[in-house]
Each structure stands twice: as C-alpha cells, then as structure tokens.
From Swiss-Prot:
MF terms in GO: histidinol-phosphatase activity; inositol monophosphate 1-phosphatase activity; metal ion binding
Residues the entry annotates as binding Mg(2+) 1: 66, 82, 84
Family: Belongs to the inositol monophosphatase superfamily.
Cofactor: Mg(2+)
General function of this protein: Catalyzes the dephosphorylation of histidinol-phosphate to histidinol, the direct precursor of histidine.
Record bears the keyword Amino-acid biosynthesis: yes
Name of the gene encoding the protein in the UniProt record: hisN
One GO biological process term: L-histidine biosynthetic process
Involved pathway(s): Amino-acid biosynthesis; L-histidine biosynthesis; L-histidine from 5-phospho-alpha-D-ribose 1-diphosphate: step 8/9
Documented EC number(s): 3.1.3.15
Binding site for substrate: 66, 84-87, 207
The name this protein goes by in its record: Histidinol-phosphatase
Source species of the chain: Chlorobaculum parvum (strain DSM 263 / NCIMB 8327) (Chlorobium vibrioforme subsp. thiosulfatophilum)
Length: 259
C-alpha cells in the first residue's frame, strides 16, 4: 500500500468516527450555504480534520474541499475532499452518507477512498491495483440488458423531469428496478455489483472525484450526460458496469450526431 492510500484510509476512518459523534443528534446544528444547500458542524469539523492530516504529511499538496477555500498545489498533486457526501441523508439520520477523499495527480484521479461509517463499509481504489470494500475485492456486474438492471439516482429531477429520449433518462422506464439510493452510496452499489447504473444529474468535483477510480478499478466506467469520460467539470455523473456503460455511451453519441 502506498503512503498516499494509507493516509487517505486513516483520515477517512478518523473523519468517519467524528461524524458518528453527530449522527442522529436532535440538536445537530444545520446552516445554509450561499447556494441554499445545507451544511452541518460535522461537515466542517470532518473536513478540517482531513485537511490538517494531509497538510501535516504533504505540506506542498493542494487541497480542494466542499466546505473551505481551495489551497493551491505547488507540485501537481491535489487532494479533493467531501467530508459528508449526502448531508441531507446525514441530517435525517439516514446512514447512506459517505466521507470521500481522492488524490488527483497532474489532472488524473490516482486514488479514491469512501467511508460509510454508519454502515461499516470502507471502499478504496488506487490506479492499477483494483477496488476493494473492507479489504475484499469488488467488481461490477455483467448485466447488459436494461430490463434486468437496477438503476439508482440521487436527485428527484431524474424522475420528475419531462419525458426525454436521452438514453440515461430512458432507463427510468426500461430498467427492471429504479430506486433512490443516491449520492456516493449509489455509485458504490455499482462498483460492488449490486446495481448496474447510478445517475447524478447535479454534480460538483468533490462529489465525483473519489467515485471515479473506485468504479473504474472495479471494472466499470464513469461519464457525463454527453457521454464524455472527462467528467470533473462535466454535465452530471453516470457510473455503470462495463456492458451497460458501453451501450449508453454509444447511444448518447448517436443521439448527439442526430441533433
């Protein structure tokens, strides 16, 4: 295990334990950010813990997180942090939130760690080394038929938006099972072979950075609503097993050419 991955795992576990001290509290303090999304004291304290741990070990590395200003990199390495992905779930006592840490090196995601402390599930991946949950390898499913697939989503707009011919939107009709197990948990269901497609129509870099290496090292793929696999600044995030991902990307490409 590289020092980078070891540090990410240690900090994700420490931050996860911190969040559990707040999880389920009726007295939890919730604030509104400028974009009207919620943030809690647990979000801020967890990100501070992670930032301090990284800076102590790698002081020249960049830091880019959801809750605080970016600290620029001096060496091409940038850590991307989402201290609590699924803050709304966290606030309501739903255990499907995750602590996310990723390392980007020269613009490419090198590793990702996602800890679900309330579930006891810890995912990790480093480029070329496979993906793991609690130390055991995980792999995407081989299901290729829409009718046999499980599709999960985060935002209610996925179901409520007007009918669309977009291949990803069409899955809400064609899939065998559609459920709202969203945020990073949905993407880890894909990585571990328990779902075939996860859809996020609204996405920020910290929401997807750790997801990408884990899904890809598990044999899956990540792309945006235009079928592009360069998605940090893309239009949403779709993760899928390899079979369905290839089909969706091809169908999106055909639709783009027909416009």
């Amino acid at each position: 295990m590289t020092p980078d991955l070891q540090l990410a795992l240690e900090l994700a576990e420490k931050a996860g334990k911190l969040t559990l001290d707040y999880f389920g509290r009726r007295s939890l303090q919730v604030f509104s950010k400028r974009d009207d999304t919620p943030v809690t004291e647990a979000d801020r304290n967890a990100e501070e813990l992670i930032r301090q741990g990284i800076s102590a070990k790698f002081p020249d590395d960049g830091l880019f997180g959801e809750e605080f200003d970016e600290h620029p990199s001096g060496n091409g390495r940038r850590w991307i942090i989402d201290p609590i992905d699924g803050t709304r779930s966290f606030i309501h006592g739903v255990p499907l939130y995750g602590v996310m840490i990723a390392l980007e090196v020269e613009g490419a995601m090198q590793l990702g760690v996602i800890n679900f402390p309330a579930l006891g599930e810890l995912y990790q991946a480093e480029r070329g080394s496979g993906a793991f949950m609690n130390g055991s390898p995980v792999q995407v499913s081989a299901i290729a038929e829409n009718s046999a697939s499980t599709v999960v989503f985060t935002e209610k707009e996925y179901l409520l938006d007007p009918p669309s011919n977009h291949p990803v939107d069409q899955l809400r009709i064609d899939a065998g099972l559609v459920r709202g197990w969203g945020d990073c948990y949905g993407h880890m269901l894909v990585a571990s072979g328990r779902a075939e497609v996860a859809v996020d129509k609204i996405m920020s870099p910290w929401d997807c950075a750790a997801v990408i290496p884990i899904v890809e090292e598990a044999g899956g793929c990540c792309f945006d609503y235009r079928g592009r696999q360069s998605i940090i600044d893309g239009e949403g995030l779709v993760s899928a097993n390899n079979a369905m991902g290839r089909n969706l990307i091809a169908a999106i490409g055909n639709g783009e050419r027909d416009r």
